[in-house]
Design a protein with these regions (language model features):
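Gly/Trp-centered helix-boundary motif
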Residues: 1-167, 171, 260, 303, ...
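Alpha-helical transmembrane segments of integral membrane proteins
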Residues: 137-361
Length: 361
């Protein structure tokens, strides 16, 4: 069927589906955001649950078994471990002790965005005193798998909320500047230049110091989003302005003006919709910047604070060289940061190619 039979959105989707790397990135992001959304159910334990007796327990993902020593199928299980010495984080396997990995097990109570509470988890273990650490544990004996899942709620949502705010501001103010021109354009462009001169990360560091080290994690979370969105919209607005300067010269805009359509409706119905392809592609490519900014700030200790979990403050354990050499699983959050960034870049590149009117279906 000819391309003229499809809407612009359908054309972009059809082109995107043919890009395997872009679809791979989309699939990874869907999986990550779904697991983040249902983190309380998927996580075996609460992110703050501690057990100092099993601090720095190595990952047991490779130690999962399906058959016991006699060849009998038992489902997924691990052999129990015991600490070699109370002062040393070394463990030895107890072959005679079997700890089963259970599905739909009862455990710590979690809340689904304040709507309801439950203690049902997708994964659990048969012996509450012998937890199974698939990704290992940290200094306080907290399950890294659970903290990665809970941490994704903060790290992944920062990117989405931040880009929604910055793109909305950028498209609106850029559209206003480009359409009205004159003094409005001049004033907005000078304001944008001021915003572009503000270093976002340093502004957050300054505000964090001004508010003190006791700032709750919730307030730090919103401060990071607001500041990053405040300094991020200006670059988008400048690009949208340039697009609007070209779009407003089209015949359909002139016809709408001749028919007496209000300027606000012209911008909303005829101009901004023509910038959506740019907005979608830009948003996809910019989300990793917001995620990495939160990670960097939490890694430096000025973002999300303990005991809350975010991928950034989980990586703080990697600042210690001994931790890196002895407990390499502290880098597990880094793998998910890399995976997320890679997926967004793959998807963004695919969307950019699909939105290109010169590309063929």
């Amino acid at each position: 069927m000819a391309e003229s039979h499809y809407s612009p959105g359908q054309l972009i989707w059809l082109k995107l589906k043919r890009n395997r790397t872009a679809m791979f990135g989309l699939g990874v992001l869907v999986a990550l955001y779904l697991s983040s959304f249902f983190a309380g159910f998927l996580a075996p334990a609460h992110y703050a649950t501690q057990n100092r007796e099993v601090s720095w327990h190595p990952p047991q993902l490779d130690d999962l078994h399906l058959f016991d020593a006699e060849g009998t199928f038992r489902g997924p299980f691990v052999y129990g471990t015991k600490r070699v010495h109370p002062a040393i984080s070394e463990y030895e396997v107890e072959p005679g002790v079997v700890v089963e990995l259970e599905l739909f097990a009862r455990g710590d109570t979690w809340s689904f965005f304040g709507l309801f509470e439950s203690d049902l988890h997708l994964l659990g273990w048969s012996d509450p005193k012998r937890p199974i650490f698939l990704f290992g544990s940290d200094l306080y004996g907290r399950d890294l798998l659970s903290r990665v899942l809970y941490g994704s709620q903060i790290s992944l949502s920062v990117g989405i909320i931040g880009i929604l705010i910055s793109m909305s501001l950028g498209m609106f103010l850029g559209g206003v500047a480009g359409y009205f021109g004159g003094r409005v354009d001049f004033a907005l462009m000078r304001f944008i230049e001021v915003i572009l001169s503000i270093p976002g990360l340093y502004l957050i560091l300054t505000l964090r110091q001004a508010f003190g080290q006791d700032l709750p994690s919730t307030q730090s979370y919103f401060m990071i989003i607001i500041v990053l969105a405040f300094v991020g919209w200006a670059a988008n607005a400048r690009v949208v302005r340039g697009m609007v300067l070209s779009i407003k010269e089209n015949d359909y805009v002139t016809a709408a003006e001749a028919l007496g359509v209000s300027r606000v409706n012209i911008i909303r119905k005829h101009i901004l919709p023509n910038t959506w392809s740019f907005a979608i592609v830009t948003a996809t490519l910019y989300v990793p910047y917001y995620i990495l900014s939160e990670v960097a700030l939490s890694f430096l200790g000025v973002g999300i604070q303990e005991p809350e979990a975010s991928w950034g403050n989980m990586l703080k354990d990697a600042q210690n060289i001994r931790n890196l050499t002895d407990y390499s699983w502290v880098l597990v959050p880094g793998f998910f940061i890399f995976l997320t960034t890679m997926a967004f870049n793959y998807l963004g590149d695919g969307l950019r190619d699909a939105a290109d009117p010169r590309s063929k279906l």
